[in-house]
Design a protein with these regions (language model features):
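P-loop NTPase catalytic phosphate-binding loop
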Residues: 3-109, 218-330, 342-419, 426-430, ...
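Conserved alpha-helical scaffold flanking the Walker A/P-loop in AAA+ ATPase domains
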Residues: 333-339
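N-proximal, solvent-exposed amphipathic alpha-helical segments enriched in charged/polar residues
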Residues: 100-143
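Short, hydrophobic beta-strand segments
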Residues: 152-163, 354-358
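Short edge beta-strands and adjacent turn/loop segments
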Residues: 135-158, 344
Length: 493
C-alpha cells in the first residue's frame, strides 16, 4: 500500500457516561428530598455491610472486635484475646477434632476460598463461559449469576448459585468442564437445590481413593435393618446404606470393577440373620462358582452354571414368590415382615447376561427371562430381593432395567453406558462412571428411583480371609430357618 494512500481511522468506541436519575432533578426538589435520599444511602450502606458480614463473618467480626479492643484499651487487649482463643481452640481441636474441623476449620477455609478464588474470578469466568445475560449495550447491561454461599469441605468446594432468568441446571451442566478448569478443580457437578438455585460441586481430590476394610462381624443374634444395610461409605464420609426391603439392585461394571464387593458387603451385613435362618440366600454363578463358591455355606442353594439347574432355581424362587404373596393376602398383610414367620429371600445372580442373553438354548433363555421378570415385578412385597450383576448394560442384553429400583454403576467402558445404567441425563449431572480409575475397585455411582441426583460411593473390600471368617461364622450357627413354602411346580407364570 502506498504511503500516500489514505485510510479511514477506526471509529472511536466510547460509552456515554450514565448519571443517576436523581442527579437530574431540580435543586429545590433535591433539597426537599434530601432526608429521603440520606435514609436510602444509609440503608444501602447497611445492606452492603450486612452482606459482607454474612459472607465473611469470622474475618470481619474478628477484625472489628480486635480493632475495637485495641483502640478502646491498649495493644495488650487484642493480644490477650487472641492468646485465649488460641488456647481454647487448641483444647477443642485436641479433645474434639471432628467438631473443631466441622465448625472452625471449614468456616475459615470457606471464607478464604470465597475471597481468594471465587470473588476475584467469578465474573470473568461467567463472561468467558457465556453464562451471563445482556439486556442492552454497555457493561451495566450485563447480568451475572450471583454467588449465594461457598462451603469448602477440603476435597471439594460447594458453591450455591442463584440463576438468572432463562437459565436452568442443564445450562451449567453443559459447561461443567469449563467451570472446573477455570476454578482449578478436577471436575464440576451440578445439583439442583430449589427453583433458581443450584449447587456447583467443584471437586479437587478423591476422598474414596483408599480401599475400605470390611467391618467386624456382628454378634450372633444382632438385629439387622433390611431397610438400611451398611455396605460402605459415601463420598461425603457417611455410611452407604443400601435398602434391600422392597427393592431390587442392578450392579453394572466391567471386569475387575469390584462388582462382587457390593455382594460380599451385603452378605457380611446380613450374616447374623443368615446364621439364624431369618435370611435365606440363593445364588447363581455361571462362571463355575469361581466367585460365589468361595463361601458356599452362606447359600441355601448355589448353582454354578447357566443351564437347566439355574433356570429351575429361578422358577423355584418365582413360584415361591407367588405362593408367599397368596399367603400374605389371606392373612390381610400387604408387605412381608419378620413377624410373618417366613425368612427374607435374597437371590444373587452373578453375570446375569450369561443366563438371560448368552444362553445358547432358546427355550432355556426364554424360561429364564420369564422367571426373572416375574420375580422382579412381584417379589418386592413378599420379601424377595434380587441382586443382579452384569457387564454389558445394553438394552439388547437386558431390556428390563426399569424393574431394578436401585442401580449401581461401577467402572464402565463408554460414556453412553452411564445413562444406560443410571438413567438419561445422569452423566451430565456428574455421574462419570466411565472415568473411575482402575486402581479403585469398589467405587461406584448409585441412583435410586425417584431421586434426581446420584451418589458416589465405595463398598467394603472383602479379602479371602474375610470370606473364610464369614463362612465359618454362618456355619457355626444352628441355621434353623422357619419352614419355607415349598413350590409345587416349576413354572414361573
Amino acid at each position: 500500500m502506498s504511503r500516500l494512500a489514505w485510510t479511514d481511522p477506526a471509529p472511536l468506541e466510547v460509552e456515554r457516561p450514565r448519571l443517576p436519575w436523581w442527579v437530574m432533578l431540580p435543586r429545590k426538589l433535591l433539597l426537599v428530598a434530601s432526608p429521603v435520599i440520606a435514609v436510602l444511602v444509609v440503608a444501602m450502606v447497611l445492606v452492603f455491610t450486612a452482606r459482607r458480614v454474612r459472607r465473611y463473618p469470622l474475618f470481619l467480626i474478628g477484625t472489628a472486635t480486635l480493632a475495637a479492643l485495641g483502640v478502646g484499651h491498649s495493644w495488650w487487649a487484642p493480644v490477650t484475646l487472641l492468646t485465649a482463643l488460641g488456647v481454647v481452640g487448641g483444647l477443642w481441636a485436641w479433645q474434639y477434632p471432628d467438631s473443631f474441623a466441622r465448625t472452625v476449620v471449614r468456616q475459615i477455609r470457606s471464607e478464604w476460598r470465597r475471597a481468594q478464588v471465587y470473588a476475584w474470578r467469578w465474573r470473568r469466568v461467567m463472561l468467558f463461559t457465556e453464562l451471563t445475560k445482556r439486556t442492552g449495550q454497555g457493561l451495566h447491561r450485563v447480568h451475572y449469576p450471583h454467588i449465594c454461599r461457598v462451603c469448602a469441605d477440603g476435597w471439594r468446594d460447594r458453591v450455591s448459585v442463584k440463576l438468572l432468568h432463562g437459565q436452568c441446571a442443564d445450562t451449567y451442566a453443559t459447561h461443567a468442564d469449563k467451570l472446573a478448569n477455570s476454578f482449578g478443580a478436577r471436575s464440576c457437578r451440578v445439583r439442583v437445590d430449589r427453583p433458581r438455585r443450584i449447587w456447583l460441586d467443584l471437586v479437587h481430590t478423591d476422598p474414596l481413593v483408599e480401599p475400605l476394610a470390611a467391618p467386624y462381624l456382628a454378634e450372633p443374634g444382632t438385629g439387622v435393618d433390611l431397610a438400611r444395610v451398611c455396605i460402605g461409605h459415601t463420598e461425603i464420609g457417611r455410611p452407604w446404606m443400601l435398602r434391600l426391603l422392597d427393592r431390587h439392585i442392578l450392579v453394572a461394571g466391567v471386569s475387575d470393577a469390584g462388582k462382587s464387593s457390593v455382594m460380599w458387603a451385603v452378605l457380611r451385613a446380613l450374616a447374623p440373620w443368615i446364621r439364624c435362618g431369618l435370611v435365606q440366600v440363593f445364588g447363581i454363578d455361571p462362571k463355575g462358582g469361581m466367585e460365589l463358591g468361595r463361601a458356599q455355606r452362606l447359600f441355601q442353594k448355589l448353582v454354578c452354571s447357566n443351564g437347566i439347574e439355574a433356570v429351575e432355581l429361578l422358577e423355584h424362587v418365582a413360584t415361591l414368590t407367588r405362593q408367599r404373596a397368596e399367603v400374605l393376602r389371606k392373612l390381610g398383610t400387604r408387605k412381608w415382615s419378620p413377624a410373618s414367620g417366613q425368612p427374607f429371600v435374597l437371590l444373587i445372580v452373578d453375570e446375569l447376561a450369561d443366563i438371560i442373553a448368552y444362553q445358547p438354548d432358546n427355550a432355556l433363555r426364554k424360561r429364564a427371562n420369564v422367571a426373572l421378570q416375574s420375580i422382579l415385578s412381584q417379589g418386592r412385597a413378599p420379601g424377595v430381593c434380587v441382586i443382579g450383576q452384569i457387564q454389558d448394560p445394553r438394552k439388547q442384553i437386558i431390556d428390563f432395567r426399569h424393574l431394578f429400583p436401585i442401580k449401581i454403576a461401577m467402572r464402565l467402558d463408554e460414556p453412553e453406558q452411564v445413562d444406560m445404567v443410571l438413567g438419561e441425563g445422569v452423566r451430565k449431572r456428574g455421574a462419570t462412571a466411565h472415568e473411575i480409575s482402575e486402581d479403585t475397585p469398589g467405587v461406584a455411582w448409585v441412583k435410586l428411583d425417584g431421586r434426581r441426583d446420584p451418589d458416589r460411593v465405595r463398598a467394603f473390600h472383602s479379602t479371602d480371609a474375610d470370606l473364610d471368617e464369614l463362612s465359618a461364622y454362618v456355619a457355626a450357627g444352628h441355621n434353623q430357618a422357619p419352614t419355607l413354602l415349598l413350590p409345587t411346580g416349576k413354572g414361573a407364570a
